[in-house]
């Protein structure tokens, strides 16, 4: 998916370098009529690496870099000198990048740590020079190995945002507003559905200089698990969150029904979603007086016996400190 500079899915072609040829050189020196073999080995072909970079949040820099090629190994020389190794290529990617084989869809590996370096395409081995093939019956071999070819492959890079808490809700539930008041993030906010078309990340500053990361996942609609709307693109990012915050506005006609739809979509996409910690947050509660809040709590106590809930107002900034405390506790239990 792409919006502006945010890209979380790219297809690229990579090729590692081929190995250099071994040398068939025979030693030549004044007054030595028959010098033996001294051909060196070819250098290895360059590798293509993926490297994790915590400073990256998008695959945008690879959107137009469709062909990435490492260098070829140099040929072996005389005096058993080895050819130079081919130039390696390093592709920096955000943490949470999953690498898939384009043809089979097989997950090859994923990058989750800063500085983590994995070989995507290994360079071809350099060929052995004729020096290796000398023997009592063939003292001047004129054969050397060719270098092995490099590896060519089409791969898919898919970014799954890494965050501690994922904000889950229907479009226009107020997730972006909540993110903006909890963190210093500045997501696009407007009073219409699907304002957010990309995951927005923010860092919540907590007590004693501690912090955690919260992600505003684009709004989910019924049928998202079947790909309705942009469902699969959105749901992919929720897989990495350890805690899910379900945000439902207090003016929703049926809070329980809306929550059940959200849970159902997540479960259909990946049943393991049910294993995550969940917190229900009812927003826009500054619209209620104390009596209505008491009535709402009584209803929620019946409908959500096993799921913790909280009442907040992002605009009036009510209940936000308690919300931070609750999330921190859930993340560190």
From Swiss-Prot:
Keyword tRNA-binding attached: no
UniProt xrefs under Pfam families: GTP1_OBG, MMR_HSR1
Residue ranges occupied by any Obg domain in the UniProt entry: 4-162
Principal location class: cytoplasm
Residues engaged in binding GTP: 169-176, 194-198, 216-219, 283-286, 313-315
Domain of life, source organism: Bacteria
Record GO cellular component, one term: cytoplasm
Residues that, per the record, bind Mg(2+): 176, 196
Family: Belongs to the TRAFAC class OBG-HflX-like GTPase superfamily. OBG GTPase family.
Description of how the protein assembles with itself and partners: Monomer.
Name assigned to this protein: GTPase Obg
Organism whose genome encodes this protein: Flavobacterium johnsoniae (strain ATCC 17061 / DSM 2064 / JCM 8514 / BCRC 14874 / CCUG 350202 / NBRC 14942 / NCIMB 11054 / UW101)
The encoding gene: obg
